[in-house]
């Protein structure tokens, strides 16, 4: 966090700083730590030795730029070179070469990675910290049972428990347990050492009978007993080296390796002084843990809170990349050993270059970024989404929890989260509480803990000093929850009582007992929550919805900044990287839509701008220049605004005139009524870019061809293709049009030709085409303008590297019925009707309202912040002011929010000479008129300017209909989902509903013709064309036949019979 000469000043830290620091730590420390673990490799005769000189490794600067890597679908990575030596011990010769061992993906300026042209981000994982934890549970008799859990660095767990007779057991599996004496002996201690290193030797001697003495008489006996219990082996196993190795691999390596964090935690919890370099569990640790467990039983010591953040650690991008690098080096070691053995066997010449392959490192990182749950595709819906995605904290992933097994206690807010993890911003649904977001000022410390900044309070001086505290330290201090404004730095009276936090409790205590105070009103919140004005007036559930929905806002074609916003809007837009920023001061000598040329310090710098780039959510990323030619600029000044930014500030939506009133039922249950002005004036118009791609392969019959000459297709469908067979730039394409013409060769026998084909060949000698048409066609709902075509040819040109053609089509989408809109307070709704301007309710000055919300959506949801924002937005619009709202302003003055809003409305009423803006009888409300009749409504209505967002959930992406399509092979029923042109499921309850209305024929159609009756649905088409009567299906549908076959597979025969009405003869029919 930057500091300047004024000690009392601070700035908001870079929001991507955590990602940058993690990657730098991996490059500076992690690489070398893993390199030092790489052993010297010898052959079986110990005549040849291979080793890496890791101190001289080199990371080469990437050959391509970030933008080119995205364009050409490549990985933005750095090549890693290491000097390697091959030593012949007999001749004492050494050959040294610098070898290439693989590519390491590099982090770019946004804190993300580019892998195969796709932006990916590695999110932080929060895990239980390795160490020892004590807890108490009640058994079935209601008696407290004390246990200690030792968690290893790998996540393995070992438990020590004490029974009613004060005997201590180590649980080695879910059902098996062994004596603590056997475990200590198996780890290498004898009885004398055990009794010398414990505080209660008499308790250990009390459960030492003759059988126990025999078990711990020697290390071999203890290991055999341990192995017998651990592996659940009967009989009398024999001690051997392989038995020790199996026990080492399956138990000790997974459950006893603490790591440096675990060793530190173990030393602090058990008051030990074992060196930090000793990261393995020792007999001394186990005996000290047993002593503490005995103390717990007799009421000494404190239990651990497993959900406290001091008992958690953050697994950052550095740890994940370092783990993968270590895995790659292990694979490299195995490959080198195999290559040396093979080369000696076949008497080949050995060099360091041909011993090492780069595939181990490259494929390890490719599989990590492609398959690991914590490596995710960067969500680029809008700038806020990009910056928030990298600050997520997840309990899920390898070594973590799952959404179905996590308890409520883990998901809940904990007092230690204060200033570190946002109490509001989390996902909805099954992962609620398991995926959180870092608070604005939080940072990750050296030991993997989350640290938060505070100011130290000096009673007799006015100077302030900022300190970062980990969760284990701040519970020893009294922390005032107010910031500098609330605590009145000019001089606080000694008798003043202030709210404070001490040892996970929230208290009100005297000012002279305060040790620390907060530095910022938004310190406790994440970026998403801190963008909500008047958040203190909202229910927490609605604030959660709002922080999630702001990330779903679509960048609009013309953005507008909010009239009432929070203080973090500029910092979020700046750190997202969507705006172009001057890297040095100078003068603008040229500007257009593609680039800005800057002259400064004798150099000319060309800054390329993003032009209609597609994000992975199909939104449009675009930059608009904000500087004119000849203008002098300073370093850090905004040169071009990106998507959803205005003047370098976040602008996700639009300020529109809203009214809270019912209107003919069209805003029932969160529906929203809007004016046609929002459509015709492109208020909520957005651009979306879709990508369509096709690949050409080399088949067994020959290579596929891209061509514009496609037989059997109408010329109308091929009208946009150029002579290469690819759609021309700037073409307007509709559903079904050909984007890329492609022919796939196929073999055709003489017998497979149709009769007319054979006749043409015999009479006219015309060669019938043997190629199949496999063109790229525009699917349903894809109409638009072609803005880019990319033909990507991979190097090598083999059949394993197919050519790829990508077509990008831009769509202009106005707001329409079915689209989803939302405010910043969790007030979301679906557009139900677009009303003409003259029919909308209008104000006393004749201005028609833009949106009508349901007033019943406010009291029950308790998101009253939207009312304050609505009224303050109206005042700001009339006074041409923008407001920055600090949260929890009631701490400065009672009813501070209401006083601010009413005073601004009163001033706006005076300056504009419009008394209806602020009427004392019903402040904030106004009499408005029905646009259809011109009569005033009975009650005054709340009107104002709200900041409303258009969300990514749009009706064009959701609406779907099916006449006929594909069927599942087994059940013969229509497929599921819009992408597969699927059908609508008619389940059991839907059938009941139709039966209740007595619509027998419709129900029969749904269950037969429209579903899985094969013969009946084939006959429907023919009878419909000729105008005949649709025949009634006679036999059973395919799903019933499937059921019969399933029963037959279980040796249950099921048949049905037809009984004649005339002579009651039974005709047996096979199902």
Curated annotation (Swiss-Prot):
The highest taxon in the source lineage is: Eukaryota
What EC number(s) does this enzyme carry? 2.7.7.6
The EC category is transferase
Molecular function terms, GO-annotated: DNA binding; DNA-directed RNA polymerase activity; ribonucleoside binding
Q: Which CDD domains match?
A: RNA_pol_B_RPB2
Q: Which NCBIfam families match?
A: PRK00405.1
Is Plastid one of the keywords? yes
Q: What is this protein called?
A: DNA-directed RNA polymerase subunit beta
Coarse class of the protein's main subcellular location: plastid
UniProt GO cellular component terms? chloroplast; DNA-directed RNA polymerase complex; mitochondrion
The record's comment on protein family reads: Belongs to the RNA polymerase beta chain family.
- Role noted for this protein: DNA-dependent RNA polymerase catalyzes the transcription of DNA into RNA using the four ribonucleoside triphosphates as substrates.
Cystine pairs annotated here are none
Catalysed reaction per UniProt?
RNA(n) + a ribonucleoside 5'-triphosphate = RNA(n+1) + diphosphate
Q: Subunit composition?
A: In plastids the minimal PEP RNA polymerase catalytic core is composed of four subunits: alpha, beta, beta', and beta''. When a (nuclear-encoded) sigma factor is associated with the core the holoenzyme is formed, which can initiate transcription.
